[in-house]
Structure formats: structure tokens, C-alpha cells
């Protein structure tokens, strides 16, 4: 077992002893916030961990990597990567009773950069995450109509047909790209602010501010709704989905394993990344939340419970999503077959009703044998249920295109639309609670603002500043900017932060000391599983993921998808390379958090060297003066 611990002078003075912990907890009772009850804490952590990615990214990864086969690497890495790091964050926050900034600076002043990096990432992710909530609110407000506004294409100015862009694509595509985003054809073409998105963005930030105005005192109340309602809605959708035609096609397609995918490195890479991101690790929010617990709270049990709920939610949400996707694919398959039947009937002037989906192939063969030349001129569509099921359905495309299309085909579609977007709103809002906690608490720890400022004022200023910067997402190019930040702000930086967190606890704070802390808090030392994963397995997994990601990304040209009605293959999205100036944005978004860790450590080292030099110089001067005055005695 590795027992290396780096020198860490002054640690005993920076952290309270175990004997002092209970005394400090009693002294903080009136000044430091605490959870009203255990359920409130657990719901907040679950709400932060379980977010939009569980609903729209995990199902896509299952479908892309062999269906049920993806569950194998996902569950393995959940156990060896996700749970150990979650336990570590819970335990260190509860032990040191500080936010992410205070925890790492207490372990060693040079590690304060880890807290700064977490704060930067929380800020940037929160910046665009609340814009998604604004889009959800826009769809929610438009759901109180019959028929739904995205169920039909609008007429052109002459009222003689549909708008050309909508006719070429679909009503759901048109409502998303044109009516909602009014998207441009390039990230360089910023355009103007879309007032309806700005209005929804204002509402989203206002609701968030009201919920987090007093930290856990207010978020602790909101999570009773935001963390539980999504499960109610998911269950309602599952019951409804299972009654729809073709739902089982989607579920069977999702969980049918393709074992050969297990030999694909990308499958393991994506599984590791999904486990990592779905736990909301390294944002700093979980450390802050756990610091409000009682000293003797069982953080080990908490980490296991939250992890099980998180993994279960991912699988449960995937089942719900693919029951709906199965229904949508079956509807499209039936429409495709009916179109081909109509083509055959019109081409050979057959009586209506004679040709059905059951005898269609037989009629095709008869028509081809009867009049091969006329049959050859007919254009039939390719109808394959698996091709409809396997269409990429990741991210916003799943929520705002695929699901909205499926909802339009359901009876009482406005009701299902309202329920769906309420669920997304709750998932997004509860995740934002943790993101903002990861910004507000570190800023308080940095003492940038006067201590006499109330938390309500600091929280309000942060929300206002972030809201103003988020105006960029209300432009015509806003979707492209959001995708850019989503790809780089919460990927590599989080991986590096998490690796540094584990290294700091195991090799700077000392894993033996950490074990004694946990024994004091929960009554027993962590078992051999935690020892091995903390010291070796989890850091190694993160290192491998980072190296694979680095090798893959370095060799790739940065591309993004645009919506261009003039594209030859429209309505397919066109892939084009990013302009050169975007690379500077990527370096800033991903580089600033990563570089803040070594840069702050170097700054601390140089500062300490300068202080030692000054102290030595001051001592020499003092001794010289004393000697001259005859004050020194042998």
C-alpha cells in the first residue's frame, strides 16, 4: 500500500483537532448555517448530482455504445471512480467545515488554486446552464396552446403554402431553430438579442435568486419540490410511454447488448466521463453542502445512497426516454410505410384499402412483374425501424426536437408538454443550486467583498453579473456559444481539479490522518476498498481518461454544427470548422481554471521565498543594531 505523504509544515495549526471539532460545532450553531434535517441535505445533493445530463446524455451514450453493453463499463467506473471521489468530497468538507476554497487552503496554502479553479468552473457552467432553463421556460409558456405551436408549419406570406424552411425540415425543427433561437449560420454572425429569450432568461435568473437568496436556508426548502417532482413526472411518462404503440421497440433497442463495444476504448472513455460529470464532482458545491452537516454525520452512507440514486436515475430516465423514442420511431415508420403505399396506389391506380402494410411487399412484387417500366419510375422511401431508433438524440436535440415531436402525436399533447418541461425546469434549477453555492461560498472565503455585506447582497450581485454576461446566449449565435462552453468549460478542467483533490487529500493531507478523521466522524475506519481506490485506482482512472481525451482532441480539428437552410443536404446540420479566434476562447475557458492551480502554487512559493528573505534581512538588521547599542550579552 502506498504511504507516501509530502512534507506539510504548519498543518496542525491550520486545521482544528478532532477534540476541538465538537466544540467548534456548538460555537458555530448560531453563526454558521446548518441543515434542518437529513432529508433536506440528501435531497439537495441528489438534486445537484442528478441533472439534465441524466435525462438526455446517458440515453444517447447507451444507444451509441451497444445498448445494455454500455451499462457494464458505466457501473464498473461508477463504483471505482464516482463513489470514492464523492465520499472523499463529503468527508473532507464535513471534517474541515469549510467551503471549497477554505478546505484546500487549510490543507496547504499553495492548494488554494484548487478552490479557485472550482469556482471558475462553477461560474462558467452556471453561465450557460441557466440559459437552458430559459429555453425550457419558453417552451413551457408555449405549451398552454391547442394545438402546440410546433405541431404545424406556419403559412408563408401569400398564405399559399408552408414557409419554405419549415417545409424542407419539420415543424419541430423550425420552431426550435427559427421561432425560438432565430439561429444564424455562423458563430461569427452574432446578430441581435432575441427579446423573448432575454425575457425568459430574466425570469430564470430571478427564480434562481429567490431560491438561493439565503443559501441553504432557502434552497433547503426548494429542494422538496425540485428534487422530487422529476421522479413523479418520469414515472408518469413511463406509465404513459408503455401504453403507446412501439414503446417496447425503443426499450428493447436500448438494452439489447452489443458485447463487441466493450473492446472499444471510446466506450470506456465515455462511460468514465459520464460517471464523472453526472456526479457533479469538483464543482465545490458538494464540499460546501457537506460542511453544514453534524460532525458525526455518516458521510460514507451518504455517498453510497447518493451514488445509487444517481445511477438508478440514469437507467430509469433512459428507459422512459426510449419508450417515447420507440413510439416516435414507430409513428415515423408507419408514416413511411403509408407514404410508400400511397405512392404504389397512385402509380398503378389501385383501389384504396386493397394495399396494407401486411401485403405491401406482395403488391410491390406483383406491380414490378406486371409493368417493370412504370414501377421503376416510382420513388419509394427506405423504411427501417432500427434506423429511426438509432438517430442521434443527444442534448438539446432530444429535449426540444425529438421529445416535442413525440408529444405532438400524443392525445392531450399540451398536458404532456407542460409536465415534460416542468420536469426539465426542476432538474436544471436544482443543479443550479449547487453551481451557485460553488461560486458564492468561495467568494466569501476570498474576502473580496466587505464582511459586513449581507449574503443576500453578494448573491444578488453574482446573479446580476452572470445574467448580464449571459446576454451572449440570447443572440442569434447564442446556441453556438452555449455548445462551445458546454464542450470545454465542464470537461477537462473538472477532471484535473478532481485529480488534484484526490492527490491533495491522499498525499498532502495524508490518507492515514484522513482515515482517523473518518473514524472519529462515523465510528469506523474506511475499509480496504476505499483505501485502494483513493490511493491508486481512482487517480489512475482519471489519468487514463485525461490522456485518452487529450490524444483524441489534439488530433481533431474543432468542428461545430450549424443550421443553414441553403445547405445542399438541408435539413441535415452542416459541420464546419470553428474560426481561428475560437481557439483563444477555448484556451481561456478550459485553460484559466486548469492553470489557476499551478499558478497559485508558484505564486505562494515565490511569496514565501521573498518573505523568508525579508525576515532574514530584518533579523540581521536587528542583531546589528543591538550589537552597536551593547544590548547583546554573552
Swiss-Prot record:
Sites carrying sugar chains: 158, 182, 258, 354, 368, 555
Superkingdom to which the source organism belongs: Eukaryota
Residue ranges annotated as Extracellular topological domain: 63-67, 141-192, 243-268, 326-413, 478-487, 553-581
Key words of the record: Amino-acid transport, Cell membrane, Glycoprotein, Membrane, Phosphoprotein, Symport, Transmembrane, Transmembrane helix, Transport
Assembly and interaction partners: Interacts in a tissue-specific manner with ACE2 in small intestine and with CLTRN in the kidney. Interacts with CLTRN; this interaction is required for trafficking of SLC6A19 to the plasma membrane and for its catalytic activation in kidneys. Interacts with ACE2; this interaction is required for trafficking of SLC6A19 to the plasma membrane and for its catalytic activation in intestine. Interacts with ANPEP; the interaction positively regulates its amino acid transporter activity.
Localization, UniProt: Cell membrane
Family according to the record: Belongs to the sodium:neurotransmitter symporter (SNF) (TC 2.A.22) family. SLC6A19 subfamily.
Tissue expression as described in the entry: Predominantly expressed in kidney and small intestine (at protein level). Expressed in the intestinal brush border (at protein level). Expression not observed in other organs, such as lung, skeletal muscle, brain, liver and pancreas. In kidney, expression is localized in the renal cortex but not in the medulla. Substantial amounts of expression in the proximal tubules. The distal nephron segments and the glomeruli are consistently negative. In the small intestine, expression is exclusively localized in villus enterocytes.
GO BP term (any one): neutral amino acid transport
Membrane-spanning ranges: 42-62, 68-88, 120-140, 193-213, 222-242, 269-289, 305-325, 414-434, 457-477, 488-508, 532-552, 582-602
Gene Ontology terms, MF aspect: neutral L-amino acid transmembrane transporter activity; symporter activity
Protein name (record): Sodium-dependent neutral amino acid transporter B(0)AT1
Modified-residue entries (Phosphoserine), positions: 17, 627
NCBIfam families to which the protein is assigned, alphabetical: Na_transp (NF037979)
Side of membrane Cytoplasmic, spans: 1-41, 89-119, 214-221, 290-304, 435-456, 509-531, 603-634
Function description: Transporter that mediates resorption of neutral amino acids across the apical membrane of renal and intestinal epithelial cells. This uptake is sodium-dependent and chloride-independent. Requires CLTRN in kidney or ACE2 in intestine for cell surface expression and amino acid transporter activity.
Organism ancestry: Eukaryota, Metazoa, Chordata, Craniata, Vertebrata
A single GO cellular-component term on record: apical plasma membrane
Gene name in the database record: Slc6a19
Reaction it catalyzes: L-alanine(in) + Na(+)(in) = L-alanine(out) + Na(+)(out); L-cysteine(in) + Na(+)(in) = L-cysteine(out) + Na(+)(out); L-glutamine(in) + Na(+)(in) = L-glutamine(out) + Na(+)(out); glycine(in) + Na(+)(in) = glycine(out) + Na(+)(out)
Main location class: membrane
Gene disruption phenotype: Deficient mice exhibit reduced growth, impaired body weight control, insulin response and amino acid absorption and excretion.
InterPro entries named in the record: Na/ntran_symport (IPR000175), Neutral_aa_SLC6 (IPR002438), SNS_sf (IPR037272)
Topological category with respect to the lipid bilayer: Multi-pass membrane protein
